[in-house]
């Protein structure tokens, strides 16, 4: 199963044409496989980060950033 993560408000550009054309990246979204998410969570756990998320992974980016800030990584 793939989950969709939204970059709205993050101003993250994943597309060179977007950078060159100076188009807004506010509506860009990324699909991530559940296995990739679990692998990332395992790596973060090994680094000492405590990341909680709901079953839809909807707040995972905020949780990861908050945990990293708390760890001073």
Swiss-Prot record:
UniProt entry keywords in alphabetical sequence: Early protein
Upregulation: Expressed in the early phase of the viral replicative cycle.
Record-stated family: Belongs to the orthopoxvirus OPG058 family.
Descriptive protein name: Protein OPG058
Lineage: Viruses, Varidnaviria, Bamfordvirae, Nucleocytoviricota, Pokkesviricetes
